[in-house]
């Protein structure tokens, strides 16, 4: 039965490929890097005030995918290129389609990978304000990682944005163990994954406008509430 369910899921999802919008992919390329490792490569002696950790959607390229570069660009406009570090989740997070069918919407290895980035941010730059985000499987990954974090680190995450949240129904539009007022979930009308399905319909591929405007605006507002407007 489990094999049948997984096979059915993979067939349904594969029939809806590509899992990203070509226009969003083009915009991501035009904005520049779809891979960012500022936290991993950064020097603790020159920490940014803000660290953004983001998980891409299934099958997306780089570690920022299609939506991450837009958010990153807006954050850098607000805080300066030296004022914010951008870090995508790579490594053990393979963003494979099959992992969507796992109980938490992604793999245990992926959750450990993102947890490690939050922990590294806390160790390397203990005074930095953390923000986070994720799209599709990456939204489930961000939620699971934040849920599992030590409360002292979780409390440092000023805001989190989730697009096409595959665990939206199960988690009632929230991230467990994390304040609702620090969470912004973007679920388009007709995006079936937000209502408990794993079928990718057209609305699931249309979060570009949110990544360019409301999502980074929310994160910027939350950071400034913690650090001030400077």
Swiss-Prot record:
The lineage of its organism: Eukaryota, Fungi, Dikarya, Ascomycota, Pezizomycotina. GO terms for cellular component: extracellular region. SUPFAM superfamilies: alpha/beta-Hydrolases. It comes from the Eukaryota. Keywords: Disulfide bond, Hydrolase, Secreted, Serine esterase, Signal, Virulence. It catalyses: cutin + H2O = cutin monomers. Catalyzes the hydrolysis of complex carboxylic polyesters found in the cell wall of plants. Degrades cutin, a macromolecule that forms the structure of the plant cuticle. Allows pathogenic fungi to penetrate through the cuticular barrier into the host plant during the initial stage of fungal infection. This is Cutinase. PANTHER family: CUTINASE 1-RELATED, CUTINASE 2-RELATED. One of its GO terms (biological process) is carbohydrate catabolic process. It is found in: Secreted. Disulfide bonds join 47-125, 187-194. The record marks 58, 137 as: Transition state stabilizer. The keyword Nucleus does not apply. Residues 1-16 form the signal peptide. One of its GO terms (molecular function) is cutinase activity. Its EC number is 3.1.1.74. The active site is at 136 (nucleophile), 191, 204 (proton donor/acceptor). The 2 disulfide bonds play a critical role in holding the catalytic residues in juxta-position; reduction of the disulfide bridges results in the complete inactivation of the enzyme.
């Amino acid at each position: 039965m489990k094999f049948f369910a997984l096979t059915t899921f993979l067939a349904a999802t594969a029939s809806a490929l590509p899992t990203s919008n070509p226009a969003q992919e083009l915009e991501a390329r035009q904005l520049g890097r779809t891979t960012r490792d500022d936290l991993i490569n950064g020097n603790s002696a020159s920490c940014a005030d803000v660290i953004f950790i983001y998980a891409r959607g299934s099958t997306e390229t780089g570690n920022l995918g299609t939506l991450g570069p837009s958010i990153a660009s807006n954050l850098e406009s607000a805080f300066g290129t030296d004022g914010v570090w951008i870090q995508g989740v790579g490594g053990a997070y393979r963003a494979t389609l099959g992992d969507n069918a796992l109980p938490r919407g992604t793999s245990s290895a992926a959750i450990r990978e993102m947890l490690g980035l939050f922990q590294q941010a806390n160790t390397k730059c203990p005074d930095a304000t953390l923000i986070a985000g994720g799209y599709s499987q990456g939204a489930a990954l961000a939620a699971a990682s934040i849920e599992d974090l030590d409360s002292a680190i979780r409390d440092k995450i000023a805001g989190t944005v989730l697009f096409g949240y595959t665990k939206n129904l199960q988690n009632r539009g929230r991230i467990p163990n994390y304040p609702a007022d620090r969470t912004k979930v973007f679920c388009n009308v007709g995006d079936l994954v937000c209502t408990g399905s794993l079928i990718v319909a057209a609305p699931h591929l249309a979060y570009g406008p949110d990544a360019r405007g409301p999502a980074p605006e929310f994160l910027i507002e939350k950071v400034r509430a913690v650090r001030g407007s400077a």
